[in-house]
């Protein structure tokens, strides 16, 4: 979940800044073609900037430390396990990091398979058995081997393009009028207000689509973990998370697997644990 939140937050920030620039300067002009070209350029700029900053931002957000030289048995086990799984998945060895947090959490990020990162919290290492942690690591390795971050960036770029394009086409129509001479004029104030409101509304709809795709990716990563270490280990890891959820108040934590059941599934980046376990059992 962390990698998704960071990606979307960065993307939204870039989109907001670029959207204000477009609205204030009127760079795209009034023509549909001009708006479409600018929507493509600015839409993909937000997602690609988010993608290439994802690894650095993720590490900084959790104050993670990349393991360059294992200092203890746990770090050695992590490096050996990730190395073995990466080789089996056919991808280059990613960087491995540990960060201090009581949350049971792990995530993978990075712009390319050759420049990726797998990070694990101390909470996960302290609350899971080696078999369960191995399954979680395999899940993250599967995200990398599936190219999920790149695919997510491309999808977000397309969604951004539609958000920008539709909001500005509608805003242009609403703000445009004809004077007594038959010349078309446009109220910049109305255009700015309408385009910003529509961008926020369409942005919510785009987020629903992005979250649906994220849930689909999680099922694929679970299946990938099952192929790397066996589905029983992955089921055990998810069941462990269920047990922890029952005994700890983890609501609001950035967790790679834990899902807050009070939220609508439409806005979940991960499917409910019950559905994931059921899907694994049906493999």
UniProtKB/Swiss-Prot annotation:
TM helices/strands, residue ranges: 4-24, 33-53, 147-167, 190-210
Cell wall biogenesis/degradation recorded as keyword: no
Topology in the lipid bilayer: Multi-pass membrane protein
Disulfide bridge map: none
Enzyme class (EC, first level): hydrolase
Active-site positions on this chain: 140
Enzyme Commission (EC) number: 3.4.24.-
Keyword Plastid: no
Domain of life: Bacteria
GO biological process entries: proteolysis
Positions contributing to Zn(2+) binding: 139, 143, 218
Cellular component GO terms held in the UniProt record: plasma membrane
Compartments, record wording: Cell inner membrane
Cofactor note: Binds 1 zinc ion per subunit.
PANTHER family: PROTEASE HTPX
Family: Belongs to the peptidase M48B family.
Protein name, entry field: Protease HtpX
């Amino acid at each position: 979940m962390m990698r998704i939140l960071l990606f979307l937050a960065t993307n939204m920030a870039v989109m907001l800044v670029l959207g204000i620039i477009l609205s204030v300067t009127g760079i795209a002009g009034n023509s549909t073609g001009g708006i479409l070209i600018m929507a493509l350029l600015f839409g993909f700029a937000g997602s690609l900037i988010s993608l290439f900053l994802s690894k650095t931002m993720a590490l900084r957000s959790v104050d993670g430390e990349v393991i360059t030289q294992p200092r203890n048995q746990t770090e050695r086990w992590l490096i050996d396990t990730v190395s073995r799984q990466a080789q089996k998945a056919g991808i280059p060895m990613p960087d491995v990091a540990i960060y201090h947090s009581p949350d049971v959490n792990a995530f993978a990020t990075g712009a390319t398979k050759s420049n990726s990162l797998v990070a694990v919290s101390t909470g996960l290492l302290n609350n899971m058995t080696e078999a369960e942690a191995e399954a979680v690591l395999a899940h993250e390795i599967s995200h990398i081997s599936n190219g999920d971050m790149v695919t997510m960036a491309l999808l977000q770029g397309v969604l951004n393009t539609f958000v920008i394009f539709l909001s500005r086409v509608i805003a242009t129509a609403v703000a445009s009028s004809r004077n007594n001479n038959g010349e078309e004029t446009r109220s910049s104030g109305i255009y700015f207000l309408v385009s910003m409101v529509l961008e926020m509304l369409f942005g919510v709809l785009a987020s629903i689509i992005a979250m649906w795709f994220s849930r689909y990716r999680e099922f694929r990563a679970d299946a990938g973990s099952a192929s790397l270490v066996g589905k029983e280990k992955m089921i055990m890891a998810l069941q462990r998370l269920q047990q922890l959820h029952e005994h700890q108040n983890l609501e609001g934590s950035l967790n790679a697997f834990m899902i807050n059941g009070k939220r609508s599934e439409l806005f979940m980046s991960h499917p409910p644990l019950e559905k994931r376990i059921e899907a694994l059992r049906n493999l």
